[in-house]
């Protein structure tokens, strides 16, 4: 069996590591560097360049030099972030036929996974050059807050690169593996703060040691998949452009060549300001007008940079609070804070994190290499090279189905350890219902329509039976990569239908973040909606059972007893169509009051011989959740 390599496929830089003699080793690429820029260039003569060679020629070929592609994976073209990136990226972002964000390279539309595959090929070749043998298997890392679509796209990129992706693992979890593997004994709870080139994650992880076996259990995760070093660079670029326009009256935004030079200079200045208090951005011959060539020379202080990006750093603090709350912990419960990602080298970031946790982050973890090292460790675990290590990761958002009244019924809640499988029995909402539509949704809201529709499928061939009698078992199964499989089975006939949620119907990060924000902001309206639906269901049940008793009574019940019941039923059915909970409750009560004669009649009939059947029916009813499945048009698929 060959080596399973570990790859950190980053927004700005990528890194590859292997297990060598029981230790993780980060490999140097052909240029002699331990990290490779995640930059791909397509030259005029048809050559594809990856890494440093692509970065070096970017100034002369800005429109065909692609970077930060990870920010586009799993995104729709119309996403707010994509539209914002279009304005600042020198290359062309276009809409695909399915609405995804793709790229235009020399007139050809290319999907982000195809471009990311070029970086993965470079990582694969680096490992093969070191090992002297073919490499076909890898563990690849993704941000913890990546959704199903983004995880699928990463696996696709691996497949395009000729790799069998044995496992997708979360970046903070990988960093925890790198940190915790060689540490001493004892149980610890750590916070991994991962601010990379394009994404931000926070994970709270518990490391337990029992009889020599280490368990890495993720307690909670949170993040922002559109926050990273690229955003910090953009603030610096915009500042330099504004200063130059103030000085020279020329807007450099319209000059791709100048913008590419500015991007390089801004990134370099940002890095220098992590160790220096001031730096000069000096770009001679940046542009020209009728009066001759123009030179850019601007002094930037660390204080100025900090004022430009302060809100970005602050944006990373809220997810820390949510993650701690979800884990049921306080700041004092955290033993160690680990910083991952190149952007965490910025002193302001380190200071904010230290201020929040009340302790200095550890300095013995390499922020650029820790994730790749952890991926290699996981590869070693899968290959049997590394013993006594167990990794327990989580799913970032709740998953469920739409049930009666448009409610989302969760089968798997957020921060559940994966892989996981959960089943629940539902039933029909109508008598003799022969088919149901299973509508799968993801998110934290109570109303199914407020969450993301992941997909739907039909289960038909259900045998005729009164409502609430058929037993339909719905099973959600999330694999170790965080990818969802759903099945529905009619327990009576044994008929089953399955679906794997495809990448095209995954969530994009804006939707994830919006769901979490909405769930917090709308907790009260969600509670009221849930109460209204429960009352509606009670009213529906009362109307259904009363109508059934009326029909069974037939002419045996006098007309003067029937008339008020019929009137009360009509009023209740009208109220059920409205949104007034108190009105529905009043009409249920009114129906109960006028139905006393009917109930007495039903009890007499039951005493006459129907008691056994009714008891059996009630028992079956108790074992099922009343649910309604109705076809929902999924316009976002």
Swiss-Prot record:
Keywords: ATP-binding, Chaperone, Nucleotide-binding, Phosphoprotein, Stress response. Gene3D superfamilies: 1.20.1270.10, 3.30.420.40, Actin, Chain A, domain 4, Substrate Binding Domain Of DNAk, Chain A, domain 1. The modification Phosphothreonine is found at residue 199. It holds the Pfam family HSP70. It comes from the Bacteria. One of its GO terms (molecular function) is unfolded protein binding. The keyword Electron transport does not apply. Residues 548-561 have a biased composition (Basic and acidic residues). Residues 534-544 have a biased composition (Polar residues). Induction: By stress conditions e.g. heat shock. Residues 603-615 have a biased composition (Low complexity). InterPro entries: ATPase_NBD, Chaperone_DnaK, Heat_shock_70_CS, HSP70_C_sf, HSP70_peptide-bd_sf, Hsp_70_fam. Residues 532-561, 603-637 are annotated as: Disordered. Belongs to the heat shock protein 70 family. HAMAP family: DnaK. Acts as a chaperone. This is Chaperone protein DnaK.
């Amino acid at each position: 069996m060959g080596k399973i390599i570990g790859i950190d496929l980053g927004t700005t830089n990528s890194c590859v590591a292997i297990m060598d003699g029981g230790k993780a080793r980060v490999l140097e690429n052909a240029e002699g560097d331990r990290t490779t820029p995640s930059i791909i260039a397509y030259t005029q003569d048809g050559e594809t360049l990856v890494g440093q060679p692509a970065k070096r020629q970017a100034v002369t070929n800005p429109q065909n030099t692609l970077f930060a592609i990870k920010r586009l994976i799993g995104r729709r073209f119309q996403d707010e972030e994509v539209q914002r990136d279009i304005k600042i990226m020198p290359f062309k972002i276009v809409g695909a036929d399915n609405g995804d964000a793709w790229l235009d390279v020399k007139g050809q539309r290319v999907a982000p996974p195809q471009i990311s595959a070029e970086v993965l090929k470079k990582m694969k070749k680096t490992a093969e050059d070191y090992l002297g043998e073919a490499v076909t298997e890898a563990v690849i890392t993704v941000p913890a807050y990546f959704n199903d679509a983004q995880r699928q796209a990463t696996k696709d990129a691996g497949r395009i690169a000729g790799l069998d992706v044995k496992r997708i693992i979360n970046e903070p979890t990988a960093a925890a593996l790198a940190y915790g593997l060689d540490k001493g004994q004892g149980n610890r709870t750590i916070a991994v703060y991962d601010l990379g080139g394009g994404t931000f994650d926070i994970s709270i992880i518990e490391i337990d040691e029992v009889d020599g076996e280490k368990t890495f259990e993720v307690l909670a995760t949170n993040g922002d998949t559109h926050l990273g070093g690229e955003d910090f660079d953009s603030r610096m670029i915009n500042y330099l452009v504004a200063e130059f326009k103030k000085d020279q009256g020329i807007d450099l935004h319209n000059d791709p060549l100048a913008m590419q030079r500015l991007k390089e200079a801004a990134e370099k200045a940002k890095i220098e300001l992590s160790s220096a208090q001031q730096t000069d951005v000096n770009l001679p011959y940046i542009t020209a007008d009728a009066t001759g060539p123009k030179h850019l020379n601007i002094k930037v202080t660390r204080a100025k940079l900090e004022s430009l990006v302060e809100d970005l750093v602050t944006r990373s603090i809220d997810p820390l609070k949510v993650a701690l709350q979800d884990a049921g912990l306080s700041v004092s419960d955290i033993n160690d804070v680990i910083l991952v990602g190149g952007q965490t080298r910025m002193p302001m970031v380190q200071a904010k994190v230290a201020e929040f946790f009340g302790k200095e982050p550890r300095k013995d973890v390499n922020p650029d290499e820790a994730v790749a090292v952890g991926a290699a460790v996981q590869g070693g675990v899968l290959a049997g090279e590394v013993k006594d290590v167990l990794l327990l990761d989580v799913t970032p958002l709740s998953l469920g189905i739409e049930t009666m009244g448009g409610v989302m019924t969760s089968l798997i809640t957020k921060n559940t350890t994966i892989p996981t499988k959960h089943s629940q029995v539902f039933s029909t909402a109508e008598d003799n219902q022969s088919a149901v539509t299973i509508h799968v949704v993801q998110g934290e809201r109570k109303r199914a329509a407020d969450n993301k529709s992941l997909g739907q499928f039909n289960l038909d061939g259900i045998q005729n039976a009164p409502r609430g009698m058929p037993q339909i078992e719905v099973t959600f199964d999330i694999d170790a990569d965080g990818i969802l499989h759903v099945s529905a089975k009619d327990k009576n006939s044994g008929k089953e239908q399955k679906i794997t949620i495809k990448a095209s119907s995954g969530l994009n990060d804006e939707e994830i973040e919006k769901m979490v924000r909405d769930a917090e902001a709308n907790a009260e309206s969600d509670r009221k909606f849930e109460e209204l639906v429960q009352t509606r269901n009670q009213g529906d049940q009362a109307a259904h059972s009363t109508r059934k008793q009326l029909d069974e009574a037939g002419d045996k019940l006098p007309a003067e007893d029937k008339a008020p019941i019929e009137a009360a039923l009509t009023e209740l059915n009208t109220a059920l169509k409205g949104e007034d909970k108190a009105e529905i409750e009043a009409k249920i009560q009114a129906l109960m009051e006028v139905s006393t004669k009917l109930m007495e009649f039903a009890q007499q009939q039951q005493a006459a011989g129907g008691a056994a059947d009714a008891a059996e029916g009630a028992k079956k009813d108790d074992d099922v959740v009343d649910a309604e499945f109705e076809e929902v048009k999924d316009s976002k698929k």
